[in-house]
């Protein structure tokens, strides 16, 4: 394990840059923090270990043939985004996902703004085996440290695609997806009455504005979760959980 003792080290400077979106985009890499990520099979590029915990996770660290560096607490804090860190930071490469290999069931996220919501939805999609997630360019960066933390490792198990809205519409139409919009409307069906087709794409919208008109206008059906009081609406992550689990139930998978 390589020991780095200076925060002026080139690698440390590079790792600090990965805390910014523009560098994550340019390098195709991102940071994840916490030893739980080492339970996944995805091979890291680099593992950074705080020196005081180096003996706690030897078994996990030995699973991977990759660059490992040992740093003191001061340098580690320069890289960490957590107050009570477990002392492990991992550098992963983003997946090179193929739009030509999409599954028959897609989740579309339209301008989701809150990192916690996005991370929770990614974790949910992993749990319900909706592995392909298409995000509009207005959606928060999925490799943001808060999103990564909320995914609890599920970021490693899903395929993410950031596209312009018109690109998404073209993709769905050309590939004959049944487009289901979660949208409050007189014509909207309760979520448990939806008829699924061979290929389905369900769209969840921005926390404040909901789904954009472009998606509403091209949808094949609209669905709602009935509200039994005067509550205005449900949190988008909660709504996603209810609907995606119901769809898997309709398919007979749970």
Feature locations, PLM:
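Glycine/small-residue-rich loop that forms an oxyanion/phosphate-binding "nest" at active or ligand-binding sites
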Residues: 68-92
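RNA substrate-binding interface of SAM-dependent RNA methyltransferases
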Residues: 99-187
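Boundary-proximal intrinsically disordered activation/regulatory segments immediately upstream
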Residues: 1-55, 139-140
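Structured adenosyl-cofactor binding patch, chiefly the S-adenosyl-L-methionine
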Residues: 87-90, 127-128, 147-153, 213-254
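Active-site/ligand-binding-proximal alpha/beta "capping" segment
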Residues: 181-231
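Short acidic-hydrophobic, aromatic-tinged amphipathic segments that line or gate anion-handling sites
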Residues: 3-6, 68-72, 159-166
């Amino acid at each position: 394990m390589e020991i780095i003792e200076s925060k002026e080290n080139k690698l440390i400077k590079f790792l600090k840059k990965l805390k910014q979106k523009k560098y994550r985009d340019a390098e195709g890499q991102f940071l994840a923090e916490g030893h739980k990520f080492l339970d996944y099979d995805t091979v890291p590029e680099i593992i950074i270990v705080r020196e005081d915990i180096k003996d706690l996770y030897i078994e996990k660290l030995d699973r991977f043939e990759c660059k490992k560096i040992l740093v003191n607490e001061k340098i580690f804090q320069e890289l960490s985004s957590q107050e009570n860190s477990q002392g492990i930071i991992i550098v992963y490469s983003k997946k090179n996902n193929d739009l030509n290999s999409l599954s028959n069931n897609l989740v579309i996220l339209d301008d989701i703004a809150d990192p916690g919501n996005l991370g929770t939805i990614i974790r949910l999609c992993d749990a319900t085996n909706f592995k392909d997630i298409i995000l509009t360019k207005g959606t928060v960066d999925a490799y943001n440290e808060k999103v990564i933390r909320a995914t609890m490792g599920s970021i490693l198990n899903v395929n993410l695609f950031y596209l312009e809205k018109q690109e998404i519409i073209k993709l769905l139409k050309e590939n004959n997806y049944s487009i289901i919009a979660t949208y409050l409307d007189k014509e909207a069906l309760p979520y448990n009455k939806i008829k699924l087709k061979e290929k389905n794409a369900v769209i969840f919208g921005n926390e404040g504005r909901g789904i954009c008109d472009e998606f509403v206008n091209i949808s094949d059906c609209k669905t709602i979760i009935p509200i039994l009081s005067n509550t205005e609406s449900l949190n988008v992550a909660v709504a996603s959980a209810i609907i995606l689990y119901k769809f898997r139930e309709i398919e007979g998978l749970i």
